[in-house]
Amino acid sequence: MRGYKQLKIPVLDAAGNPAWPEMFPVKRIEEMRDSVGHRHFMAQMMLQAVPPERTRLDPGALQFYDAEFDAAHCRLAGARMTGLAAYWDPSTGRRKSDGSVCVLIYRDDGARRAYLHDVRYLVVDDGDAHPLSRQCDMVLDFMHQHDLRRIAIETNGIGNALPEIMRDVAARRGANVYIQKIINTRNKETRILDAIEPLLTTGRLFAHTRLQGSPLMAEMMGWSPLGATGHDDGIDAVAGALMMTPYVLRPPGAAIRPFAANTNFKI
C-alpha cells in the first residue's frame, strides 16, 4: 500500500451539483439530508466531519404546536400519529439530586416526525420516607392525564427496583399498567446527540407550547456533547423516548390486517 493516494469525492461539489447525478440526483440527496440530519450528512456524504464541540441543541429549532391528542382518530396537530412512547428516567427525586423525568412522545413515522407532547419533572420532599413510591404515584397521575396504559422505565441503577414498586402502587389504585424495562449502556452524550440532533436540525422535532417555559429549554441551550455542562436529565429522558420502539397507535375500532401463510405447496 506504499505510495497510495486517497481519493475523496463528496456527493455535492462546491457549486451544489451532484457528483453522480444518475445515482444520487438532487432530490434524493435532499431526502438523505432530511433523514439523517446535518451532522451525519456532512460526515458521511460530504466527507467533512463536524467537531463535537460545535454541535448544539437549539430550542429555537423546535416546531411548536398547541393541540391535544385526538385518540378517536389518532391525530395530533393535523397529522396522523402512528405510535407513542412514554418513558421514565428515574432518580431519587430529591431537590439536589439528578432529575427524575417522565416523557410522552407521539410519532408520525410516515413523515419521520416526533412530537414532544409532555415532560414532567418529578420532585419529592426531602423528608419523604418513601420517595420512589411517591414518584410512582406521580407517574401514574401523568399516565392518567394522558390516558396511557404502558410506560418504559430505565432500570439502570436506582430504576432496577421501580417496576415492582410501580406495579404495587398501581394495584393499590386499581390501575392496570404495562411496564417495559429499558437498560441503557451507550455513552449518554452520544445517545442524546444521535437521538435528538437529526430530528431537530431538519425541522422534524415538534414540541407542545406547554414546554416553552420548562427546564427542558434551558437544558437544551446549555448542553454540550463534551459533557459536564449542568443538568441534562430532561433531554436524556427525551433521547430515551425517541430511541425506544414505540407503541403502535390505531384508532378505536380500526381493523387489524390479517396475515395468512400459503401452505399449498409440496416438499
What are these regions (language model features)?
Residues 1-31, 48-52, 56, 108-227:
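Mg2+-dependent endonuclease catalytic cores in nucleic-acid-processing enzymes, primarily RNase H-like
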Residues 15-90:
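ATPase catalytic-site recognition across NTP-hydrolyzing enzymes
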Residues 77-80, 93-98, 231:
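A short catalytic or substrate-binding loop motif that flags glycine-/basic-rich loops and adjacent residues
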Residues 90-92, 157:
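Short, glycine/acidic-enriched loop or turn micro-motifs at the edges of active sites
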Residues 96-110:
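Acidic, metal-ligating active-site segments
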Residues 101, 134-138, 236:
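Well-ordered alpha-helical segments embedded in enzymatic catalytic cores
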Residues 242-267:
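Acidic two-metal-ion nuclease catalytic site recognized across multiple nuclease folds
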